[in-house]
């Protein structure tokens, strides 16, 4: 199987998000890369499901709370920008202050 670089990146983000979910299920708090991967995966999969940009910008803020991440992570993640593929093309989705 041959994957383009952007396809490998999407697969890596999905794998990191899956690992983050497994760690959350075990009661662990997420670190910075895990938190960003989980939010990114939420946006990418939401776009694939046909959800709109503004809806994903809002719902991306509801993926994680400050209690679910390690100390300092919420302060480090001020925004997450994701290029996601929508039915009408690729768009940049920015989730501001994603961890509340």
UniProtKB/Swiss-Prot annotation:
SUPFAM superfamilies: Urease, gamma-subunit
Swiss-Prot/TrEMBL catalytic activity: urea + 2 H2O + H(+) = hydrogencarbonate + 2 NH4(+)
Transmembrane segments: none
GO terms, molecular function: nickel cation binding; urease activity
Chief subcellular location: cytoplasm
Gene Ontology CC annotations of this record: cytoplasm
UniProt-listed GO biological process terms: urea catabolic process
Pathway note: Nitrogen metabolism; urea degradation; CO(2) and NH(3) from urea (urease route): step 1/1
Keywords: Cytoplasm, Hydrolase
Entry-linked NCBIfam families: PRK13241.1 (NF009712), urease_gam (TIGR00193)
Similarity annotation: Belongs to the urease gamma subunit family.
Assembly and binders: Heterotrimer of UreA (gamma), UreB (beta) and UreC (alpha) subunits. Three heterotrimers associate to form the active enzyme.
Name this polypeptide is given: Urease subunit gamma
